Regions:
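BTB/POZ (also called T1 in voltage-gated K+ channels) oligomerization domain detector
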Residues: 1-133, 308-413
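Active-site/pore-lining binding-face segments in mid-to-C-terminal subdomains
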Residues: 241-336
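Post-BTB helical module
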Residues: 111, 115-253, 258, 262, ...
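Short linear motifs in intrinsically disordered/low-complexity regions
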Residues: 7, 15-16, 21, 183, ...
Length: 413
């Protein structure tokens, strides 16, 4: 296992661990980290299958002659009281085992805390975000790991720095979304999106929906389909992010009762909920719980968004809306899933709108199109939250069938 932080560099050999370590299941090899097993460290942590030996003082929120409770720093690092640590951390044979983060995450944090100017990995950490040629998935994950753990440890200044680096990387979102993203990383992104900075939170959720967007024919790639099912099937995702769970729910719902995914990947209880949603979620423009009147009535003065444009660009904004979001149609179909299968294309039309308003030929200098786009992003987030609430209501209903559900849908369980 590499102890390095950049996959472009060949990893050095890992240091062996003394043979007095306790037996581990499945013959898991325990190794010392080749960089952050410090000879004079005071505490040994086992994270994944890697031992780190560090001074706990590096985990304090701010450096200085303060009397910190290092146990509280460890509790913050663990992050979840429901996942107790084991071991005392006094030796390799009795390490303090932490299961709520990965060795990769901790290694990235230590790079930020212990790196030195001149070290190539540390210099890359300081500069990669500023160079779009280096905007890779590995670099994105590095800043994400640092930001999440800094948040956890209350290192607010460093968390803000990681936040700004990610903002720079999101300028290359189009190339990043082409990569395969695992569920753990997607949930990490959603976790970091729980920030008071609404604009940054919206950017991260836009990015997540772009990762989980079907092709123009409405089909998800096999990896993305498995990812959606994994996210939908995890109660932890709902706890962390209603927006992410709601979007995963919509995508899984769009597959329909005849899909192999429903019949082979989902439990009976999940299928009951989806059947009920399939029957109930028709004529979405009139489906009050979803709250998308702004989408289908953009010129409506109360809920529509086109009124945000000025007299110079109002006609251009309206035309741009019609050729992007307008392609969703009226969303008034009574056929099960017709409207749902239109709505899953929302991220694609959002990107088309964003590209159009960034044109240098835009008729006004007030950036009205950008104001509309920010409102669109906030409304889509709210829609995804509403989808989570709709799902929760269906779960509460006996048998997963809401009193508002239609009839005539084949409930083949």
């Amino acid at each position: 296992m590499s102890a390095q932080v950049d996959v472009k560099v060949a990893p050095p050999p890992n240091n062996p661990v003394p043979s007095d370590l306790p037996a581990t299941p499945a013959a898991r090899a325990i190794i010392r980290d080749s960089t952050y097993y410090l000879d004079d460290g005071s505490t040994i942590l086992l994270i994944g299958n890697t031992l780190f030996k560090i001074h706990l003082s590096i985990l304090v929120p701010s450096i200085g002659p303060n009397n910190y409770d290092y146990d509280s720093c460890l509790r913050l690092l663990i992050g979840n009281p429901g996942f107790p640590s084991t071991g005392k951390g006094a030796s390799d044979a009795d390490p303090l085992a932490i299961s709520t983060l990965s060795a990769r995450q901790f290694r990235h944090l230590l790079l930020a805390l212990l790196g030195r100017p001149g070290d190539p990995f540390y210099m890359a950490l300081l500069t990669d975000a500023k160079d779009r040629c280096r905007h890779t998935q590995e670099v994105f994950i590095r800043y994400l790991d640092i930001g999440n753990l800094d948040d956890r440890l209350h290192m607010w200044n460093l968390a803000d720095w990681a936040h700004h680096q990610l903002e720079l990387l999101l300028k290359s979102a189009s190339q990043l979304i082409e990569k395969s993203w695992d569920a753990e990383t997607v949930v990490q992104i959603a976790t970091f999106g729980k920030t008071p900075d609404e604009e940054f939170s919206n950017q991260l959720h836009v990015f997540l929906r772009r990762i989980l967007t079907p092709n123009p024919c409405g089909n998800l790639a096999p990896h993305d389909l498995s990812l959606c099912v994994s996210l939908y099937g995890s109660l932890g995702v709902l706890t962390i992010s209603q927006e992410l769970f709601g979007w995963a729910f919509l995508l899984v719902l769009s597959l329909g009762h005849r899909s192999a995914t429903w019949s082979t990947k989902l439990a009976r209880e999940d299928r009951l909920i989806l059947y009920a949603a399939q029957a109930e979620m028709v004529k979405l423009s009139e489906y009050t719980p979803l709250g998308i009147s702004w989408l289908v009535q953009p010129r409506q003065p109360t809920n529509g968004l086109l009124h945000l444009s000025c007299s110079l660009c109002s006609a251009r904004c309206a035309d741009t809306w019609d050729t992007t979001f307008g392609k969703l149609g009226t969303l008034q179909s009574a056929m099960p899933l017709d409207d749902v299968r239109q709505l899953i294309h929302l991220p694609r039309y959002r990107q088309m709108f964003a590209k159009a308003i960034s044109s240098t030929s835009w008729p006004c200098k007030e950036k009205c199109g950008e104001a509309i786009l920010q409102s669109v992003d906030a409304r889509i987030n709210k829609m995804c939250q509403s989808l989570s609430e709709i799902h929760a209501d269906l779960v509460k209903t006996p048998g997963g069938v809401s009193e508002n559900a239609g009839v005539g849908i084949p409930y083949v369980i």
